[in-house]
């Protein structure tokens, strides 16, 4: 008898999109709070190694291409929209793989959080500033955190899957 693959239920995307929406909600609310509280460039030390700041990132991670002429806003927006389409396809197809899907949902929420910033403000709002003495890690936001956590979980899931197939 031949094995057949059954399609996931039509609602298979719902829980994963729910996670993405929660990420977007927390990301956007945190950015609104920072925008209402801080002037551009202002910083408030919370601990000896952590500040809240308000900076604008017109580029990508770590300010990559932030000094370009403006084309990067639309390029990174298009990249975020493209990633959204690919991730939704993967979630629809592999929604039964929980860790894989949670990983993608976090990445999706983070990507869309930053796409919203680019469309609304023309740049991404960053405000989390970790530092050690005078050395500062580049400021980031909750969307970036979700993308990073999702990427780490994705790598972990893949390593686990590879080890399981041996």
Swiss-Prot record:
Residues spanning the membrane: 9-29, 45-65, 71-91, 100-120, 135-155
Known catalytic reactions: Release of signal peptides from bacterial membrane prolipoproteins. Hydrolyzes -Xaa-Yaa-Zaa-|-(S,diacylglyceryl)Cys-, in which Xaa is hydrophobic (preferably Leu), and Yaa (Ala or Ser) and Zaa (Gly or Ala) have small, neutral side chains
Keyword Cell inner membrane annotated: yes
Predominant localisation class: membrane
Location within or outside the cell: Cell inner membrane
Role noted for this protein: This protein specifically catalyzes the removal of signal peptides from prolipoproteins.
Name of this chain's protein: Lipoprotein signal peptidase
Species whose genome carries this gene: Burkholderia cenocepacia (strain ATCC BAA-245 / DSM 16553 / LMG 16656 / NCTC 13227 / J2315 / CF5610)
Gene coding for it: lspA
